[in-house]
Curated annotation (Swiss-Prot):
It comes from the Eukaryota. Signal peptide: none annotated. It is found in: Cytoplasm. This is Serine/threonine-protein phosphatase CPPED1. GO terms for molecular function: metal ion binding; protein serine/threonine phosphatase activity. Keywords: Cytoplasm, Hydrolase, Metal-binding, Phosphoprotein.
Length: 312
């Protein structure tokens, strides 16, 4: 697919916002709605993991293609339609500059372009998209392929912030880019606090924590210092939930009024969960989410209790 063709298909983020939604129209609360969250399609990991060669493996990704096609098919069948479909990072397995990256990216774009055009895509960067220690070059490559690496948008009276969590993990090779996101985030959190939006929600790849704010540092979470500072900023600004991936298992916990939601993968499972998607219903008072296996969502769609919430 050409770059121009990709731009036509994906509602890509530019200028730190998402052109799929008019921020002025969307600032007013108009009633309950829902969106779908997925994470880690990570084309190539299943083969790499099965052979024990996660650094250089991943020369096949037919399984991930089929799973992501099933996810897209399930989303397209949903009625009513979700407001958007967010993918929380690790779009492909091949790191920047490595073999198979172009092919994996091409195949993922081919699958994602089938998403109903009335369901905008929201794309979040992960460590495999940018490298564990991103550089200005890897960030630029992501932005050229998928749109801005961090941005905000309004939907139905709720403010959504998309973060580049690699800057929070290791920004040693691009400190100026991290500082720019930090400054932008402070501005956005100030807006969330002052405008008293109905809800404010964050999307990022790496979770703040997996279960508890005071858990030990791990590959799958942010360091204690970073997570505590960020969690405090979020709670002060009234952020209600953070949705992430990265762990390839379902997990999560709470800190004060903040819900940290960790969703398992569309692709490779590292625990006992199933390949799946999370449905998130936003009502005037609360945010209700439920993880569905791809088979469940394909066969039965939204559960009746979630449908009832949409009528409130």
């Amino acid at each position: 697919m050409s770059a121009a063709g990709a731009a036509d298909v994906f509602h890509r983020a530019r200028g730190r916002t998402l052109d799929a939604f008019s921020s002025e129209k969307e600032r007013e609360w108009t009633g309950p709605f829902y969106f779908v969250q997925g994470a880690d399609p990570q084309f190539g990991l299943m083969k790499a993991w099965s052979t024990g060669n996660c650094d250089n493996g991943g020369d096949e990704w037919g399984q991930e293609i089929r799973l992501t096609e099933q996810a897209v098919e399930a989303i397209n069948k949903l009625n009513p339609k979700p407001k958007f479909f967010v993918l929380c990072g690790d779009l492909v397995h091949a790191m920047p500059g490595t073999r198979w990256r172009k092919e994996q990216t091409r195949d993922l774009q081919r699958v994602l372009k089938v998403v109903d055009q009335d369901i905008p895509l929201v794309l979040v960067s992960g460590n495999h998209d940018l490298g564990n220690a991103p550089t200005a070059e890897t960030v630029e490559e992501f932005c050229q392929t998928w749109g801005d690496d961090y941005f905000s948008f309004w939907v139905g009276g709720a403010l959504f912030l998309v973060l580049n969590s690699q800057f929070l993990y290791d920004a040693s090779k691009c400190p100026a880019l991290k500082q720019a996101q930090d400054h932008w985030l402070d501005q956005q959190l100030s807006i969330a606090e002052q405008q008293q939006c109905q809800h404010a929600i964050v999307f990022q790849h790496i979770p703040l924590f997996l279960k508890s704010i005071d858990e030990d540092d791990d590959y799958f979470n942010l360091t204690k210092t970073v997570r505590q500072e960020l969690a405090d900023k979020f709670t002060r600004a009234g952020i209600r939930a953070v949705f992430s991936g990265h762990y390839h298992r379902n997990a999560g916990g709470t800190y004060q009024n903040l819900d940290m939601v960790v969703s398992s993968a569309i692709g490779c499972q590292l625990g006992k969960d199933t390949h799946g998607l999370r449905v998130v219903v936003v009502t005037a008072e609360k945010i209700v989410h439920r993880y569905y296996s791809l088979d469940e969502l394909s066969k039965r769609g939204l559960d009746d209790d979630l449908r009832e919430l949409l009528k409130e």
